[in-house]
Amino acid sequence: MTHHDLLILGAVSKDIIITPENVEHSIGGAVVYSAVALKHLGANILAVTKLNPEDRQALEVFDRHGVPYRFLESPTTTSIRNTYHTADRDRRTCEAIGMVAPFTLDDVPDDVTAEVYYLGGLMKGE
């Protein structure tokens, strides 16, 4: 059994960011941002995420930052489209265009313990 400071559970999101100037595609989600930040701060973490296997390349963000993770398959991947209405990005419309299968207790690895279990959900129903 392995022990971690934190186990972070949440969906990786394939984000589409639309501004008056351009369209960007990026990988986001609470699990990504918190895991990368905590890893660089020296925390012993494990990220647990779900996505459709066809979108597995999204996990490269964890590899680039040395974040250990477990990947669970889902029929869908979370995806959010943020449309910013002004160049200063003060106003936006946020649309969920995909959501992973809901997380359950069965998704928490039984061979891992942690001081803190962080549930990094992005939307109701995850």
Residue ranges and their predicted role:
Residues 14-25, 40-120:
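Conserved N-terminal subdomain of the carbohydrate kinase-like
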